[in-house]
Amino acid sequence: MNEIIFSVTSAPEGGFMAQALCHSIYTEADDWIGLRAAVREAVLCHFDEGKGPAMIRLHRVEEEVLAVS
């Protein structure tokens, strides 16, 4: 496996939530630096040694609603 992709969203109570797209890996943290560390740790725990991805891609998704009138 070469890469694993996480979808990252803002948590309603603050901080961030991350979910892997093709694996059952979920984690959260209070800030971006903490999230990066939490995602890396979750990936290392999820896969057997030598079986995990070489890279982790964090795809941050933000939604904003704008009023037209």
Predicted features along the sequence, with ranges:
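A short, exposed loop/beta-hairpin motif centered on an aromatic-Gly-Thr core
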Residues: 23-33
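Short strand-coil-strand connectors
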Residues: 2, 21-23
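Short, charged, surface-exposed hinge/linker loops at domain edges
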Residues: 1-5, 33, 37-69
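Short aromatic-glycine-(Arg/Gly/Cys) micro-motifs in beta-strand/loop hairpins
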Residues: 7-20
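Short acidic, gly/pro-rich beta-turn/loop elements at beta-sheet edges
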Residues: 16-18, 28, 37, 66
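Non-catalytic surface loops within mature trypsin-like serine protease
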Residues: 10, 22, 60-63
